[in-house]
UniProtKB/Swiss-Prot annotation:
This is V-type proton ATPase subunit S1-like protein. It is a single-pass membrane protein. It comes from the Eukaryota. Keywords: Membrane, Transmembrane, Transmembrane helix. One of its GO terms (cellular component) is membrane. The chain crosses the membrane at residues 147-167. The lineage of its organism: Eukaryota, Metazoa, Chordata, Craniata, Vertebrata. It is found in: Membrane. InterPro entries: Ac45_acc_su, VAS1/VOA1_TM, VAS1_LD.
Length: 224
């Protein structure tokens, strides 16, 4: 397996036209090593301009080719590498590895693409609306909902739920502690004793009234 990493300079590459790509496509070529040597390694980025919305045109990286000895050695199909046509695309890491979010997928053809592992660090590219040979405002890949972003969001929500549950339990335990202190206090016992005494007096008073009522209802019998 060939492992290849490159720190791409933030420069707008020269544009070459190819009739096979169509009117809305361009390819940018980056050569490593001696530019005049046909055996030197070259990377070709094929970009396509399209209208995602009626009021805004976008460009996307459609294909990445690794060329050596004037022949294509590997082909990768990018996913999620796009930006408005008036912007450049920028990402900290773009590659074929899972740690790079697998933005470069090896081609399905049997050309040995799966044997290559490619990673671009500090990657930035723009193929349209170039002014003065400089990048325009960049759209970062971090703004999209990447798997790492979604995992971080899910972990944050789980942590928030755990903290909310812990706070609820803390408040409940504090309430139980206050109730226990209230029950165990001498004032509470004196109140209970006074209430029990009052209930006993009320019970005795009601029993005496019932006895008097029964005596008053006795009937006298006279025999002649």
């Amino acid at each position: 397996m060939r492992l290849w990493k490159a720190r791409v300079l933030k420069l707008v590459l020269k544009t070459a036209k190819d009739s096979r790509l169509g009117l809305n496509s361009k390819w940018l070529s980056l050569k490593l090593g001696d530019a005049g040597n046909p055996r030197s390694l070259a990377i070709r980025f094929i970009l396509t301009n399209y209208n995602k919305l009626s009021i805004q045109s976008w460009f996307s990286l459609r294909r990445v080719e690794i060329i050596s000895n004037n022949s294509i050695q590997a082909v990768f199909n990018p996913t999620g590498v796009y930006a408005p046509s008036g912007y450049s695309y920028r990402c900290q890491r773009v590659g074929s590895l899972q740690q790079d979010q697998a933005l470069l997928l090896p081609s399905d053809t049997d050309d040995g693409s799966s044997l290559w592992e490619v990673t671009f660090i500090d990657f930035q590219i723009q193929g349209f609306a170039i002014k003065g040979g400089r990048f325009t405002k960049a759209q970062d890949c971090a703004s999209s909902f990447s798997p790492a972003f979604l995992i971080g969001l899910a972990m944050s929500l789980i942590l928030l739920l755990v903290l909310a549950y812990a706070l609820h339990m803390l408040i409940y335990l504090r309430y139980l502690d206050q109730q226990y202190d209230l029950i165990a206090s001498p004032a509470h016992f004196s109140q209970l004793k006074a209430r029990d005494t009052a209930e006993e007096k009320e019970l005795l008073r009601s029993q005496g009234a019932e006895c008097y009522k029964l005596r008053s209802q006795q009937i006298s019998k006279i025999y002649v």
